[in-house]
Swiss-Prot record:
Dimer of alpha and beta chains. A typical microtubule is a hollow water-filled tube with an outer diameter of 25 nm and an inner diameter of 15 nM. Alpha-beta heterodimers associate head-to-tail to form protofilaments running lengthwise along the microtubule wall with the beta-tubulin subunit facing the microtubule plus end conferring a structural polarity. Microtubules usually have 13 protofilaments but different protofilament numbers can be found in some organisms and specialized cells. SMART domains: Tubulin (SM00864), Tubulin_C (SM00865). Keywords: Cytoplasm, Cytoskeleton, GTP-binding, Hydrolase, Magnesium, Metal-binding, Microtubule, Nucleotide-binding. GTP binds at Q11, E77, S145, G149, T150, S184, N211, N233. This is Tubulin alpha chain. GO terms for molecular function: GTP binding; hydrolase activity; metal ion binding; structural constituent of cytoskeleton. It comes from Entamoeba histolytica (strain ATCC 30459 / HM-1:IMSS / ABRM).
Length: 455
């Protein structure tokens, strides 16, 4: 068995993680107390054509028949963890995997990174115990926001320890990136830059989403006038469900955890990917509208479907692209859809990389949580792509960082937690280089020029 352990950190990471596990349980026929719904495995076997035990990669099955998520939830203060402990799925998780401190990190990266050594050790101990229940650990899926102190600082400290202890295991990271128009804290640009710099060597691939993009999707495509974090997390969870479906269900063209960085990351530093999901439709619209595989594929490349805000994606080029299809989809239909995209020349790839699409198909259709604003459909798809337009994402946060750091605003809060001012300049320089890297990768002579220089 190739197990995956998910680690949910901070308020955003824990709330998103809880939504993901709610959806996973529905998809696998597991009730909120961890018991399996009668005949749920047989139903999955009919769809996949065999005995479906792949879900054990994400769930540990106990001797009493209960299924426990291979998941750790950690926050520096108890509010969100207490909500999970008293919520509908309180009986699902292992009690020792719901970890919290007593005081939050005050939206301060430095405090989150260095101020919680006992909590860090407790979390690493829980991870160690979780790995001992694995027969062949693939790696880790980490959920966090980089705007807050815990999500940025504590995540960086934890990933440093994970990289040291589990060096050869794959580490994937789903990051909620700061949105200037939906900011929850003025120092978010500091935390985002410091976290990205600190995590650069510790994560193999990062999936980027921001609340502003999800907010717009909820408004335009679902008609939710004032979306809450509840709506946003449900939508992100649906995308994460599609990304992990090949790990949790038996099916054709399965994607292994290690294949994400292999197929998405051309160079170790440039490991930041954007996501899109389709279709996002209301239950009323789903009854009237069924997209073909060709239409589904085309909608993935619509800028309005992207879950990260780019000023103009058409100014950049694709370096790599993974598409995960679910439900009533055949390999032939996918091949025809991809061929159609290539012929239209509307999806530009960099000249130094072959125009290749990594496609995965899973026959298990997506599931909608009862009462949610979006509907489950017969077929759906999710795209993850490494695109040179990511330079625009880093440019925005770098500019906002500079506006504050030029006046040394709020820097004393970080210095008071043990940081030095030069750590800000080092991190900012690193993000500038990352921004330039992504911009230069759009130039078709990038690799040729580098190889000529090397010779």
């Amino acid at each position: 068995m190739r197990e995956v352990i998910t680690i949910n950190i901070g308020q955003a990471g824990c709330q998103l993680g809880n939504k993901c596990w709610e959806l996973f349980c529905l998809e696998h026929g597991i009730q909120p107390d961890g018991t399996a719904i009668a005949n749920s495995n047989e139903k999955r076997s009919v769809i996949t054509g065999g005995i479906d035990t792949a879900y054990n990669a994400f769930f540990q099955e106990l001797q009493n028949g209960r299924h426990v998520p291979r998941a750790i939830f950690v926050d520096t203060e108890p509010t969100v963890i207490d909500e999970i402990k008293t919520g509908e799925y309180s009986g699902l998780y292992h009690p020792e995997h719901l970890i919290c401190g007593k005081e939050d990190a005050s939206s301060n990266f430095a405090k989150g990174k260095t101020g919680y050594e006992p909590l860090l050790n407790q979390t690493m101990d829980a991870i160690r115990k979780a790995t001992e229940n694995c027969t062949g650990l693939q790696g880790f899926f980490i959920y966090n926001s980089v705007g807050g102190g815990t999500g940025s600082g504590f995540t960086a400290a934890l990933c440093e320890k994970l990289a040291d202890k589990y060096t050869k295991k794959t580490k994937l990271n789903t990051v909620i990136w700061p949105s200037p128009k939906l900011s929850s804290g003025v120092v978010e640009p500091y935390n985002a830059v410091l976290n990205t710099h600190a995590m650069m060597k510790f994560v193999n691939c990062t999936f980027m989403v921001d609340n502003e993009s999800i907010y717009k999707i909820c408004q335009k495509q679902l008609g939710v006038h004032s979306p809450s974090y509840f709506h946003l997390n449900q939508l992100i969870a649906q995308a994460m469900s599609s990304i992990t479906a090949s790990l949790r269900f038996e099916g054709t063209l399965n994607v292994d955890l290690n294949e994400f960085p292999t197929n998405l990351v051309p160079f170790p530093r440039d490991h930041f990917a954007m996501m899109s999901y389709a279709p996002i439709v209301t239950p009323e619209k789903a009854i009237r509208q069924t997209l073909s595989v060709q239409e589904l594929t085309s909608s993935l490349f619509d800028p309005n479907s992207l879950m990260i805000q780019c000023d103009d994606i058409n100014k950049g080029k694709f370096m790599s692209c993974c598409m995960m299809y679910r439900g009533d989809v055949s390999s032939r239909e996918v091949n025809l859809a991809v061929s159609g995209i290539k012929k239209q020349n509307t999806v530009p790839f960099v000249g130094w990389c072959p125009c290749s699409f990594k496609c995965g198909i899973n026959s298990q259709p997506a599931t909608a949580v009862p009462g949610s604003s979006y509907a489950s459909t017969a077929r759906s798809a999710c795209m993850i792509a490494n695109h040179t337009a990511m330079c625009q994402v880093f440019q925005k946060v770098n500019q906002n960082f500079d506006l504050m750091f030029g006046k040394r605003a709020f820097v004393h809060h970080y210095v008071g937690e043990g940081m030095e001012e030069n750590e800000f300049t080092d991190a900012r320089q690193d993000l500038y280089e990352l921004e330039v890297d992504y911009a230069n990768l759009a130039l078709d002579n990038t690799i040729e020029g580098e190889s000529m220089t090397a010779q």
